């Protein structure tokens, strides 16, 4: 009957739709059902849109009735020629009916439209269809709408309330939330105006009829009492939400009952996680909430009621409700009661729940003043699955510690133990730590001990347990414990031998007053990083101590250049200035493991950032670096800073992307080795030994020693050669890998196209078998359209993914393997060459000593400027003790000057078979052709040689201040009296008949600092870079060789 609508009416309808921003879904005309039986029926036009139903009187251009879909309560229709709509608008109920032969079409259109606009509306909230046979009702097809129709529902709610819908909310829901399959509704993602009452009401109204979201997050938005009522309506209807977070939303003792009542009334509620923390609920509000907890049909898995200003009464009611609900023992896994005052009554209520068998995995009772004895006893009985316990900020007494020790000993699942702020005495803390380490069932434990004022005593206690006791702790936080320089040094030295710790937090432990132990403390940190300890993360910020290390931290920065274990470093707040930033840049050029660096608040200037940027350009492993905002704020106005920071950010983005420099790099391989820097430390050691050998002034005659010296002189060439071999092999690998991946690009492209064709064929077959109306030509046209109209995989994209992406990662991993093999070969070579040169040096020293002894014992010394006198009968020469390798006493050294005895005319020859050779080390300025020092203390000298030169493993750490070493000089004929000095004697060797050469047993390792092998090679000043050699220990990860730290200034 739409043909009976006049053009004038149609024009009015068009204007109405434009004004209401609606579109027509159905337009018809009929006779109005009048309540008066004798009254003549009048015509009415019915217009159905997405949100409303309009009834208009023809030729009057006036809307007689306007009904929103949500206002409809019932539709009655006993016959297919008439229907009546019962609605309620502004709390006034009315009915409106029409007589029309399109009754069924109109009813079904209203049903379909309502279902489309309110897709998730529960059945009890929809209008009723009364007296309508099922045969008249069509089946409604369900559509897959973004976010379960949230946008349509939101727009309809806005229309119902007369509020303009926000296009940004609709766009976000359609293009972000839905496309990313995000099931959490977060109010923080929506930009709310200052007065957001209408927006919140519309959003909550849409959530009431939506089943898409499974989590509601309203954190930090303050609701008023009216808005809590709207939220309660949502919770009464929603049947899909599982996680409700109301952290800091303004809940109070008078609004909490509104929410609790709504939760209790919804029998279909699927809620399993509730967060009502940081609200002033108090005991009264907690009592109302506990009524829901006790009656929850499904139980609760996670419950957070922290900082709700509840006292023992409120906590007691809540814990009793947990025990009353039988579902809680099998569902509750997370319970947070922190920030409330439990005291004895609350502790008793909690223990009554914990004592029963339960599935609790995390318990947080920090800052609750609990009765530890009561709670711990319940933990031992019922909490067999507890993994995390937080008792921080509760002052522990000596009486309570044994109860915790008992719980730790009985646990087999504990992973995280938080004791921060408990001020537990050191001796009692040791009991707890020992209990953790003694429990063989506990593994990978996270131990938080920060802010306990442990001091130096606590540091010593932890250090004493670190090596062999803390075998199951992987994370240790000892921040803000007032260790000071000495304590930091002690705790780092203690963990050198630990084999499990992976993350160590030392924030805020340096005191404001710098002590003499500061360099030693920093050196201890460096030694910890270079040791066998598997430490991967180190945080050493200034913390709350406000005592920055400034320039003292530079040595730690420089040590990163050769560190091969640390993955994450935080040194924020130490005010190291631009010098530290430049040092970081230089260290990053050779560091190949650090991937996270945090270094804000270090007084870094634009010059410092520029130096850092230079190093970062040559580093491919640093991927995470939080923006140092404090330093940027201070220097963002400096010239060229913006460009510098853009380049730094570009380098970080490059490292985060897998498509790094792989092909077309002009021969600059990934992570190319800086040969001169890597080899300088060990190579200098070899050159130093060669110079010492030359300084003796004696020619090497032994064939084996000649080969050793020649090999040593070729070391630099050989090491350089193997580095070039590595670079060549890596370059060839990149070429081969590049070619293989390029060939594989075509293979992948063919596979994708084949699968696409297979899918197309199956689609066509399915459609041809299903749709009888589609003939062969139609299917053929569809196949052609798919073939030429659908999107193909770009071969260039496959090339980029495989060659530049996967290829770069594979090349980088292979390069790491090559570097590892190269390091082993280099270290082995230098070790063997150093041992050989050390042996040659000792042989030459022995030969020189023998020659000097023979010369001093057989030939008179002419032109002696010192007069001689007869020996005193009361002062006989000192007879030395026999050495372990001979039974004949060694020859007594002759005296010079006034104390020298008279020489016989024919001095007896010196027997080389019974007298071991003796050498001395005179002062550099004194001739040594005639020895005035006593040479009789051979046993002590031999012991010194065995200690300093005898092939033992070198020390792990380089000493802070090495002792000065004597310089050897060439013997001359002029002799002056010598003062008594430590005498360097040869090692004990088997006697031979050859007077000029004594076979020497080769030492088993390089010398230690302070031995003869560490003497300077000439009278010139000692080398600027001195690197202590490191032992070669067979282990999973070999500690790196200490190399010279890069200087930061000339």
Swiss-Prot record:
UniProt-recorded Gene Ontology molecular function terms: myosin I binding
Compositionally biased region (Pro residues): 862-883
Keywords annotated in UniProt: Cell projection, Leucine-rich repeat, Repeat
Segments of this protein annotated with the region Required for interaction with capping protein: 1-179
Induction: Down-regulated by Pseudomonas aeruginosa, PAO1 strain and PA14 strain infection.
Ranges occupied by LRR repeats: 243-266, 268-291, 329-352, 383-409, 411-436, 442-464, 470-493, 563-590
Positions with biased composition (Low complexity): 884-903, 911-929, 988-1011
Major subcellular site: other
Sequence motif: PXXP motif, positions: 959-963, 968-971
Compositional bias ranges of the Basic residues kind: 1033-1050
GO terms under cellular component: actin cytoskeleton; cell leading edge; lamellipodium; leading edge of lamellipodium; macropinocytic cup; phagocytic vesicle; plasma membrane; pseudopodium
Known function: Serves as the scaffold for the assembly of a complex that links key players in the nucleation and termination of actin filament assembly with a ubiquitous barbed end-directed motor. This complex is composed of at least capping proteins (acpA and acpB), the Arp2/3 complex, type I myosins (myoB and myoC) and carmil. It has at least a modest ability to activate Arp2/3-dependent actin nucleation. CARMIL localizes along with the Arp2/3 complex, myoB, and myoC in the leading edge of cells and it plays a significant role in the structure and function of these actin-rich cellular extensions.
Oligomeric and partner information: Interacts (via PXXP domains) with myoB and myoC (via SH3 domain). Interacts (via N-terminus) with the capping proteins acpA and acpB. Interacts (via the region between the LRR domain and COOH-terminal proline-rich domain) with the seven member Arp2/3 complex (arpB/Arp2, arpC/Arp3, arcA/p41-arc, arcB/p34-arc, arcC/p21-arc, arcD/p20-arc and arcE/p16-arc).
Family, as annotated: Belongs to the CARMIL family.
Protein name in the entry: Protein CARMIL
UniProt organism field: Dictyostelium discoideum
């Amino acid at each position: 009957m739409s043909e009976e609508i006049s053009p004038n009416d149609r024009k009015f309808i068009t204007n109405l739709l434009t004004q209401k921003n609606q579109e027509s879904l159905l337009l018809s005309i009929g006779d109005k059902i009048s309540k008066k039986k004798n009254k003549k029926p009048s015509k009415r036009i019915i217009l159905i849109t997405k949100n409303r139903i309009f009834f208009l009187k023809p030729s009057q251009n006036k809307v007689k009735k306007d009904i929103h879909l949500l206002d409809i309560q019932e539709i009655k229709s006993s016959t297919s020629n008439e229907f009546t709509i019962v609605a309620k608008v502004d709390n006034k109920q009315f009915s409106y009916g029409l007589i029309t032969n399109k009754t069924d079409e109109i009813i079904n259109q209203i049903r379909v439209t309502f279902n489309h606009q309110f897709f998730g509306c529960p059945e009890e909230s929809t209008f009723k269809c009364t007296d309508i046979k099922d045969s008249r009702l069509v089946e409604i097809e369900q559509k897959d709408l973004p976010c379960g129709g949230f946008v349509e529902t939101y727009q309809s709610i806005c229309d119902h309330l007369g509020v303009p819908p926000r296009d940004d909310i609709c766009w976000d829901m359609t293009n972000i939330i839905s496309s990313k399959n995000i099931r959490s509704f977060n109010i923080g993602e929506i930009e709310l105006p200052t007065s957001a009452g209408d927006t919140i009401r519309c959003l909550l109204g849409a959530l009431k009829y939506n089943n898409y979201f499974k989590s509601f997050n309203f954190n930090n938005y303050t609701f008023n009492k009216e808005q809590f009522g709207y939220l309660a309506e949502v919770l009464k209807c929603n049947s899909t939400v599982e996680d409700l977070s109301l952290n800091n939303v303004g809940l109070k003792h008078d609004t909490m009952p509104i929410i609790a009542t709504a939760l209790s009334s919804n029998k279909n509620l699927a809620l399993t996680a509730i967060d009502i923390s940081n609200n002033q609920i108090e005991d009264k509000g907690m009592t109302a909430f506990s009524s829901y907890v006790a009656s929850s049909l499904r139980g609760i898995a996670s419950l957070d009621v922290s900082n709700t200003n509840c006292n023992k009464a409120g906590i007691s009611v809540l814990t009793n409700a947990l025990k009353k609900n039988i579902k809680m023992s099998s569902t509750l896994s997370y319970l947070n009661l922190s920030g409330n005052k439990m005291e004895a009554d609350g502790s008793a209520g909690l223990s009554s729940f914990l004592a029963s068998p339960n599935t609790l995995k995390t318990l947080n009772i920090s800052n609750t003043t609990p009765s530890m004895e009561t709670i711990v006893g319940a933990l031992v009985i019922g909490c067999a699955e507890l993994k995390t316990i937080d008792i921080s900020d509760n002052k522990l007494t000596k009486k309570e510690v044994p109860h915790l020790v008992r719980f730790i000993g009985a646990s087999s699942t504990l992973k995280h133990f938080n004791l921060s702020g408990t001020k537990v005495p050191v001796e009692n803390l040791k009991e707890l730590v020992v209990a953790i380490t003694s429990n063989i069932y506990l593994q990978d434990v996270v131990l938080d001990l920060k802010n306990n004022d442990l001091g130096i005593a606590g540091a010593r206690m932890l250090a004493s347990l670190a090596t062999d006791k803390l075998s199951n702790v992987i994370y240790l936080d000892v921040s803000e414990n007032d260790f000071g320089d000495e304590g930091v040094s002690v705790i780092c030295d203690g963990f050198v031998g630990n084999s499990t710790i992976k993350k160590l937090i030392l924030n805020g432990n340096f005191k404001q007053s710098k002590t003499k132990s500061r360099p030693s403390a920093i050196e201890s940190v460096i030694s910890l990083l270079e040791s066998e300890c598997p430490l991967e993360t180190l945080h050493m910020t200034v913390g709350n101590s406000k005592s920055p290390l400034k320039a003292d931290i530079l040595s730690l920065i420089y040590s990163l250049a050769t560190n091969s274990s640390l993955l994450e470093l935080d040194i924020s707040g130490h005010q190291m200035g631009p010098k530290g930033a430049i040092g970081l840049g230089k260290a990053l050029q050779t560091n190949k493991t650090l991937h996270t660096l945090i270094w804000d608040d270090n007084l870094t200037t634009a010059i410092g950032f520029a130096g850092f940027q230079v190093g970062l350009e040559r580093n491919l492993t640093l991927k995470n670096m939080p923006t140092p905002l404090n330093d940027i704020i201070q220097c963002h106005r400096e010239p060229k800073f913006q460009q510098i920071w853009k380049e730094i950010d570009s380098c970080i983005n490059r490292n985060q992307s897998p498509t790094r420099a792989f092909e077309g790099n002009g021969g600059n391989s990934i992570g190319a080795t800086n040969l001169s820097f890597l080899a300088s430390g060990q190579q200098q050691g070899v050159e130093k030994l060669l110079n010492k050998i030359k300084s003796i002034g004696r020619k090497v005659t032994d064939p084996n020693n000649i080969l050793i010296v020649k090999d040593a002189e070729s070391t630099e060439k050989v090491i350089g050669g193997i580095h070039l071999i590595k670079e060549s092999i890596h370059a060839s690998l990149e070429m081969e890998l590049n070619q293989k991946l390029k060939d594989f690009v075509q293979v992948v492209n063919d596979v994708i196209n084949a699968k696409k064709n297979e899918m197309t064929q199956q689609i066509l077959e399915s459609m041809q078998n299903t749709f009888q109306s589609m003939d062969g030509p139609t299917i053929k046209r569809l196949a052609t359209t798919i073939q030429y109209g659908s999107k193909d995989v770009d071969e260039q994209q496959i090339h980029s993914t495989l060659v530049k992406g996967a290829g770069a990662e594979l090349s980088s991993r292979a390069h790491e393997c090559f570097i590892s093999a190269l390091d082993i070969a280099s270290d082995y070579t230098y070790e063997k060459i150093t041992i050989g040169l050390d042996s040659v040096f000792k042989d030459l020293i022995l030969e020189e000593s023998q020659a000097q002894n023979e010369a001093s014992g057989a030939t008179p010394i002419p032109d002696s400027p010192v007069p001689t006198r007869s020996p005193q009968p009361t002062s006989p020469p000192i007879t030395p003790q026999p050495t372990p390798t001979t039974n004949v006493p060694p020859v007594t050294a002759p005296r010079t000057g006034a104390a020298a005895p008279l020489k016989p005319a024919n001095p007896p020859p010196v027997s080389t078979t019974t007298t071991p050779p003796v050498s001395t080390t005179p002062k550099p300025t004194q001739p040594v052709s005639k020895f005035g020092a006593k040479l009789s203390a051979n046993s002590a000298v031999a012991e010194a040689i065995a200690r300093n030169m005898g092939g033992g493993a070198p020390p792990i750490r380089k000493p802070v201040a090495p002792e000065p070493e004597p310089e050897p000089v060439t013997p001359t004929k002029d002799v002056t009296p010598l003062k008594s000095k430590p005498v360097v004697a040869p090692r004990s060797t088997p006697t031979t008949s050859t007077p000029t050469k004594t076979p020497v047993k080769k030492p088993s390792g390089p010398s230690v600092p302070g031995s003869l092998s560490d003497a300077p090679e000439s009278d010139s000043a000692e080398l600027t870079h001195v690197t202590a050699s490191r032992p070669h220990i067979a282990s999973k990860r070999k500690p790196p060789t200490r190399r010279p730290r890069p200087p930061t200034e000339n």
